[in-house]
Amino acid sequence: MSRPHHATLESIKYTSGSLSLLDQSKLPLETVFHDVLTVEDIWSAIKEMRVRGAPAIAVSAALGIAVATQRKVDCGALKSGSEVQAFLLKSCDFVMASRPTAVNLFNCLRDLKAQVDKFDSTKPAGEVAKAFVELAEAVYAEDVGLNESIMRHGAAHILAAAKEYGREKVSILTICNTGALATSRYGTALGVVRQLFYDDKLEKVYACETRPWNQGARLTVYECVQEGIPCTLICDGAASSLMRSHKIDAVVVGADRICQNGDTANKIGTYNLAVLAKFHGVKFYVAASTKTLDAETASGDHVHIEEREPTEITTNMVTKQRVVVDGPHLSIWNPVFDITPGELITGGIITEKGVQGPAASTPHYDIASIVAQE
């Protein structure tokens, strides 16, 4: 039986009419929250990765648009229900374009737009704005519940598999940050780790530093230290040596988009881990809510991979000084996501509905069938 959940870090502070987001680009050296007052504020927070993690991006976007709309109504900038409706639709389109790879943002705002389209625009501006606020708050609350289910299903499945070869406690390898900082609470992949820790079944979690933004080193380790979760930080390039020399029971990662055939877009370096896990016989799992499933995209070949500024590789994040020599024949390639083929997800896809293992033959996953499950 799983133990009750503990309090975790919060990157999203919301009360009706007010939203503050933790600036994750400054962690762990500074803890700074920024108020979101306008739609432009939430767009910038997502684009500049002050808020990051597919679930957190979607939740923050919904709440940010809600707060910005309410403020405009309160100051009289939006005077009618039809003006509010038009502003909401335009805002959803605007924020949707802030980051292209994570499907949660697109799905969330697409669904919200569909509901806004059905609003009665003849009602007063305040009532139309309030209706959207309630929708956004429901998105926030739902994400917490999804994470709780993911962590329980994932921990139980991994423990059951480990017991088959005599392991009572497990060691997990992960990448990037998929915890409370990347979601509304608890996390997806790191949520599974949390549940193992709460149940006293975690031997250790190994966290890849996750260059170039160091989300593993800056954020995952930060969460683990705050809660006393046993954690070892490794360089990204040490993963193969770790799997060879230490007992790793499973690799558990998050996702920004899971295509119909199981191909998974996630933080750059995830594909590397999947290849290494396959070679070393370590089960590889992806943990994500069904909000991250994209049955409309056939495979990873059709996913737009975001590329970011070369300075993220060439410049020290803290000092802002360039640490790489420059020259006319030097080029920098900085994709921030990669595609892990579904066939390499050997353990399964963990969602709030349970753990879906791979089929024996291609395609190894049928994402539409997972979405359709009750």
Swiss-Prot record:
GO CC annotation terms, alphabetical: cytoplasm; nucleus
Keyword terms: Amino-acid biosynthesis, Cytoplasm, Isomerase, Methionine biosynthesis, Nucleus
The protein's annotated pathway: Amino-acid biosynthesis; L-methionine biosynthesis via salvage pathway; L-methionine from S-methyl-5-thio-alpha-D-ribose 1-phosphate: step 1/6
UniProt superkingdom: Eukaryota
Reaction(s) this enzyme catalyzes, per UniProt: 5-(methylsulfanyl)-alpha-D-ribose 1-phosphate = 5-(methylsulfanyl)-D-ribulose 1-phosphate
GO molecular function: S-methyl-5-thioribose-1-phosphate isomerase activity
Site annotation Transition state stabilizer: residues: 176
Record protein name field: Methylthioribose-1-phosphate isomerase
Job of this protein: Catalyzes the interconversion of methylthioribose-1-phosphate (MTR-1-P) into methylthioribulose-1-phosphate (MTRu-1-P).
